[in-house]
Structures are given as structure tokens and as C-alpha cells.
UniProtKB/Swiss-Prot annotation:
Substrate binds at D229, R344. Belongs to the methylthioribose kinase family. This is Methylthioribose kinase. ATP binds at N40, K57, E111, D112, L113, D246, A247, E248.
Length: 400
């Protein structure tokens, strides 16, 4: 019989007292439910002074934004905790600390990050964290390299692929990224004024063939343990610091998916800034986003190549020059996946405030059309975008 029950605020406080690692657990007295995502309950556990000390996160057995009509496995809580613990082995400085997790209750206690801010919110208001892109590139390099065939023994890797099999959450990604936006589906959400633009995408056979190839790679390439949902809303930043959270979509998949999703969210902000800020501030912010993209990729690729020189355990993959060839394919994948992220965040189920918070209707529609056009371009032109300089040139040429 399952021990699972949905936590109340009082349950969360009591759980944090037991498992939060606080020196004086009796000082934990209140819980504030802060979850604004689609899948979980999230509580800030506060002491008598009102200071948040730890976070208690519990998976719900359904998609929160839809309700019980869309059930979900609770095993995703185990996968999230084990993904974060695995990533923390190789990049502790940029992975949220998991203090305790219980698969039966689908609950996890993790460090409080109240001194950090959600990166997406900071980007939307025009704030700059100049080290964040390099730190994210470091996180991606360390976690993807050390969970790949370059580092893991084949037996260990095959066991890990099984351990992190995540079919229900992967199905959500498969549908929301690669299927729903290109058909008439009830989950899609977009302004009626975009209907002609959406229909143009759905009628574009070349685009849909390219998206089919991306979906096939997502389904079949078990290259490394991905975060699986690495967007600017799952990243916390502070002065000189960055922490990645929310890894319930973790699974073994193509490295380019994590990288492309991260780049895609920087481009969503790039496209939205003209509708969010005054012209001069928007122009400056856009230049920073392009520099962030350059820094992210250059940091990732340089670190990955360095690790392949120093830590590769597979003799065949250690052959001089192979890692660089491999990264060329990762880059190609990343550009394509980036394009699908742009499209699905504009006309699919899960939108972003980088676009939706633009108050003026015409400005918002212009930014959304820019995103759709750029997303299509990246999906189709990925084989011809050889490096990050070529990507940034394409973005600059995309207008708006």
C-alpha cells in the first residue's frame, strides 16, 4: 500500500524538522506554498523570525495546471532527486543541494535559495548577471561529459539509462516540442491574430520533416543524463553565483537538447526585449543576450574538450580530434532543438513571460512573430549554421 499523501503546510513543516538538517529544527514553524509551476507543490519552510531555511518539494500525481484529468507518475520525484544528486557530484557549485528525498512520498528537501533570483525574471526586467552564461556553460559541460560514454563505463552507462528512464515526462516533451505546435491541438494556446502564422508553419512540409528528424533524435540518442528542462525559469542567479533546479524531466538523451533549450530561452528574451524595455535599454539587453549565447557555447565546448583530453575513459573516444567532431554534431542538434523551443513557447501550451508579459498588443504580436520566424529559420538552417558566430549573424538578420 502506498504511503503517498498530498502534503499540507503543516506536513511540510514537520517533514522539514525531521529531514531539513537544521541545527534547531523546532525553530521551523511555518510553510509558505510558492509553487508556480505545473507539476509540484513547493513550500518555503520558515523559522520563528520569518526567514526561509529550506525548501520542501512534493510531486503531485497529475499536471497541476490541467488537473486530475492529466495524471502523472510520482516516480518523477525520484528521477529529479537522483538527477540533481548525480549532477551535483560533478558540478556542485551550480546544482541545487538535495538534503533528503523520499520516493514513497515523492518529496524532496533542498537548500533554500532565497538569496538568489529566478534568471528569467531578472532577464525580463533588464538585469545583467555577466557570469551566468559562463557558469551555465560549465554546468552543462561537467554534467553532460561525466554522464556520457566519454566518461562512464559502458556497463555503468547502460544501468544509468535504465535508472533514469522517464517515459511520462519525456512524452510531455515529445508532444509539446515536436507534435502539438504543428497540428490543431487543444493544448495549444496563442492569440487569434497569429492564426495565419501558425497555419503557415503547419503547412510547411520542409519544416515538419526537419522537426520529425529532431524528434527522432530526441527519442533515440541516449548520449548523457540531461536536465531535460533547462530554461531560464529553472535557473537561480545571484551576484557571481548560479544554481540549477527542477530536474524532473531528467533522462538520458541528446546533449544538444539541453544546450539548445538553454540558448532558446536566451533568444526568447532577445526577441521579447523590444516589447519589455525602452528602445535604448532593449538594444543593450539584446547585445548582452547575444554575448551570453556566445559565452555559453564557448565555455561549454572548451570545457568539454578539456575534459575529453584529461578524463576520457573510453580509448576509442579518446582518439585525438574525435571530441571536436562529436561537438559539431551536438551543435547541429542544439540549433535545431533551439528552434523548436522558440516555436513551442510561442504557440504551444507553456509560454514565457518574456513574451506574454508585453502589455501592448501590437508589440507583443510583433515579438511573437519574430520568435516564430526565427524558430523556423533555425530548424531549417541548422545544417548551415556552422558555429556560434554564424548563429549570431542569423539572429541579427532575423529582423524585428
Amino acid at each position: 500500500m502506498s504511503l503517498y499523501r498530498t502534503f499540507t503546510a503543516d506536513d511540510a513543516v514537520e517533514y522539514a524538522r525531521q529531514y531539513g538538517g537544521v541545527s534547531q529544527p523546532q525553530t521551523l514553524v511555518t510553510a509558505e506554498e510558492i509553487g508556480d509551476g505545473n507539476l509540484n507543490l513547493v513550500f518555503k519552510i520558515k523559522d520563528e523570525a520569518g526567514i526561509s531555511r529550506v525548501i520542501v518539494k512534493q510531486a503531485l500525481p497529475y499536471v497541476r495546471c490541467v488537473g486530475e484529468s492529466w495524471p502523472l507518475t510520482l516516480d518523477r520525484a525520484r528521477i529529479e532527486a537522483e538527477t540533481l544528486l548525480t549532477h551535483a557530484r560533478f558540478c556542485p557549485q551550480h546544482t541545487v543541494t538535495v538534503l533528503y528525498h523520499d520516493p514513497e512520498l515523492a518529496v524532496m528537501v533542498q537548500e533554500d535559495l532565497s538569496d538568489h533570483r529566478i534568471w528569467r525574471s531578472e532577464l525580463v526586467r533588464g538585469a545583467d548577471y555577466p557570469q551566468a552564461a559562463a557558469q551555465l556553460g560549465e554546468y552543462l559541460a561537467q554534467t553532460l561529459f561525466h554522464t556520457s560514454d566519454f566518461y562512464q563505463h559502458p556497463h555503468e552507462k547502460k544501468a544509468a539509462v535504465s535508472q533514469f528512464t522517464n517515459p511520462e515526462l519525456c512524452e510531455i516533451t515529445e508532444d509539446l516540442f515536436f507534435t502539438d505546435p504543428y497540428i490543431d491541438h487543444e493544448r495549444n494556446q496563442f492569440d487569434a491574430a497569429l492564426t495565419p502564422d501558425v497555419q503557415t508553419l503547419r503547412d510547411d512540409r520542409a519544416l515538419k520533416l526537419a522537426v520529425a528528424g529532431l524528434k527522432h533524435r530526441f527519442l533515440s540518442k541516449a548520449e548523457a543524463l540531461l536536465h531535460g528542462d533547462i530554461h531560464s525559469g529553472s535557473i537561480f542567479v545571484a551576484e557571481g553565483r548560479l544554481k540549477v533546479i527542477d530536474a524532473e524531466f531528467g533522462f538520458y538523451g541528446p546533449m544538444g537538447f539541453d544546450i539548445g533549450t538553454a540558448i532558446g530561452n536566451l533568444l526568447l528574451n532577445y526577441c521579447g526585449l523590444p516589447g519589455l524595455l525602452a528602445p535604448r535599454e532593449a538594444a543593450a539587453g539584446r547585445e548582452r543576450r547575444l554575448e551570453d549565447i556566445r559565452t555559453l557555447w564557448q565555455t561549454f565546448s572548451a570545457r568539454f574538450l578539456a575534459l575529453s583530453e584529461s578524463d576520457c575513459r573510453e580509448p576509442a573516444l579518446a582518439e585525438s580530434g574525435y571530441a571536436a567532431l562529436f561537438l559539431q554534431q551536438v551543435w547541429l542538434d542544439a540549433i535545431g532543438f533551439c528552434g523548436t523551443e522558440l516555436i513551442r513557447r510561442t504557440i504551444g501550451l507553456a509560454h514565457v513571460v518574456d513574451l506574454d508579459s508585453i502589455q501592448e498588443t501590437d508589440a507583443r504580436l510583433a515579438c511573437q512573430r519574430h520568435v516564430l520566424s526565427l524558430g523556423r529559420t533555425l530548424v531549417l538552417a541548422a545544417p548551415h549554421i556552422a558555429d556560434v558566430d554564424a548563429l549570431l549573424a542569423r539572429v541579427r538578420q532575423s529582423g524585428a
